[in-house]
Design a protein with these regions (language model features):
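Conserved D-loop beta-strand region of ABC ATPase nucleotide-binding domains
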Residues: 1-2
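Interdomain motor-coupling "hinge/lid" segment immediately C-terminal to the ATP-binding subdomain
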Residues: 5, 9-117
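Accessory nucleic acid-recognition modules appended to NTPase machines
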Residues: 73-171
Length: 171
C-alpha cells in the first residue's frame, strides 16, 4: 500500500467535481478471514469449532491484511513498514508534525496498550511532550489515519462515558 496523505480528509471533496462515492476499505473482518480460508463460520460440530478457534488465534496474532494472507510476505515486516509509511508519509506530512519521534512514541504506546484507557497526562510525562493537547492531537491523527479507532468507554452513565478514551487497533 502507498501513502494516502492527500486523501485523508474531506477537503479532498472540494477538489473533485461531479459525483463521487466514498469507499473505506478496512482489513478483513474475522468472518471474511474465515471465508477466504474456507473455514466454516456457522457449523457447531467439533471440527468446525476447533478450526474456528485455531483461525481466531491466528487472526488475532496476524491481523486481517489481505496482502499477508498467502504467506508470501513476512507479516511482521509488512505491518512495521505499513505503520512507518502511515506515520511518516500520511500523518507527519499532512499535519506538519515537528517532532516525529514523539508521534511515534505515542503511536507505539497506543498500539501496545490497545483496548485500555488512554491517559494523555501519563503519556505526556513519560515522553516529556510539552502539552497534553499535543498528545491528544497525535492520538487524533492516529484515528484520522485509520491506525486506531479512538472511542469513549461504553456506559449507561454519562460521567463514565466522559472518562478517558480507549483505543482499538485496526489490523
Amino acid at each position: 500500500t502507498g501513502s494516502n496523505a492527500n486523501l485523508l480528509s474531506d477537503e479532498l471533496i472540494t477538489h473533485l467535481t461531479g459525483r463521487y462515492n466514498e469507499i473505506r476499505l478496512f482489513p478483513f473482518s474475522f468472518e471474511e478471514y474465515c471465508r477466504i480460508n474456507n473455514i466454516d463460520i456457522v457449523g457447531q460440530h467439533t471440527k468446525a469449532v476447533g478450526l474456528r478457534g485455531h483461525a481466531l488465534n491466528k487472526y488475532l496474532m496476524e491481523g486481517g491484511f489481505p496482502e499477508t494472507m498467502d504467506g508470501a510476505i513476512d507479516k511482521t515486516a509488512y505491518t512495521k513498514a505499513l505503520l512507518d509509511t502511515v506515520i511518516k508519509k500520511d500523518i507527519c506530512k499532512r499535519y506538519k508534525v515537528r517532532y516525529p519521534a514523539s508521534l511515534r512514541q505515542v503511536a507505539d504506546t497506543v498500539i501496545d496498550n490497545f483496548c485500555q484507557e488512554i491517559n494523555f497526562e501519563n503519556i505526556r510525562e513519560t515522553y516529556a511532550i510539552r502539552s497534553v493537547q499535543t498528545v491528544k492531537n497525535y492520538v487524533s491523527y492516529l484515528n484520522t489515519a485509520y491506525l486506531a479507532r479512538i472511542l469513549h468507554k461504553y456506559s449507561f452513565k454519562s460521567v463514565e462515558r466522559q472518562s478517558n478514551l480507549k483505543s482499538y487497533i485496526i489490523d
